[in-house]
Amino acid sequence: MPVDVAPGVIKKLMFFTAAMVICPLLTFFSIKQFTTNTIVSGGLAALAANLVLIGYIVVAFMEDTTDVKAESKKD
């Protein structure tokens, strides 16, 4: 059973998946260069992961759903 998924949705998902992996790792090791305290590095990496997640939620809520609304009115 094929499902029609818009290419834009897949691109957003792939972008935020990569960002969820890359941003915290980059933050952790970048901050670790400036300080030896791994708790600070880990905390900021967790903050980076949360910011990516919040960004994904905001983008998901702002996504255009006019096609879905038009089809539900037809039925």
UniProtKB/Swiss-Prot annotation:
The entry's localization annotation reads:
Endoplasmic reticulum membrane; Endoplasmic reticulum-Golgi intermediate compartment membrane; Cytoplasmic vesicle, COPII-coated vesicle membrane
- What is any one GO biological process for this UniProt entry? vacuolar proton-transporting V-type ATPase complex assembly
Topology versus the membrane:
Multi-pass membrane protein
Q: What is its main location?
A: endoplasmic reticulum
Q: Which residues lie on this side of the membrane: Lumenal?
A: 30-41
Q: Which InterPro entries match?
A: Vma21
Q: Does the keyword ATP-binding apply?
A: no
What Pfam family is a match for this entry? Answer: VMA21
Sorted keywords for this record are: Cytoplasmic vesicle, Endoplasmic reticulum, Membrane, Transmembrane, Transmembrane helix
Task: Provide the transmembrane region boundaries.
Answer: 9-29, 42-62
Q: Which residues lie on this side of the membrane: Cytoplasmic?
A: 1-8, 63-75
Please state which protein family the record places this protein in: Belongs to the VMA21 family.
Function comment: Required for the assembly of the V0 complex of the vacuolar ATPase (V-ATPase) in the endoplasmic reticulum.
UniProt name for this protein: Vacuolar ATPase assembly integral membrane protein VMA21
**Species this chain originates from:** Vanderwaltozyma polyspora (strain ATCC 22028 / DSM 70294 / BCRC 21397 / CBS 2163 / NBRC 10782 / NRRL Y-8283 / UCD 57-17)
